[in-house]
Amino acid sequence: MARRSILLSQRLLLMDKFNSIADAIDCGASMTEQATGRLMDVDGGTCALGAAMVAVDLTPITANLPLLVKRFPQPMPMICPICDGEMPRSSHYKHLALLVHLNDFHAMPREQIAHWIRSQLS
């Protein structure tokens, strides 16, 4: 139990290095190839969300998505920049779900996803 607490403390410190989830995506994207359909593939490739997780030393096994949401809050739903107006019912996403949608459905490069997030948060 103490080891788990130490690991959580280390991950929180890693998360504090990043001002936004976009920064974490950029960092993780620089360490891995892009993957779709899963957080991390068998070759170590990651989706946008997986890249952010790699940056803070999380894996699909140690994933703590509530911790990511708490550290990188998104106060309102975001609208998919590609689906907007085309599919109104499915173009509204909350926080981390939009990262998965842009990565998997639109095959948007992770760095472009990070750039778009920054443009929405500024």
What spans do the regions from the language model cover?
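Domain-length accessory/inserted modules outside core catalytic folds
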Residues: 1-46, 53-122
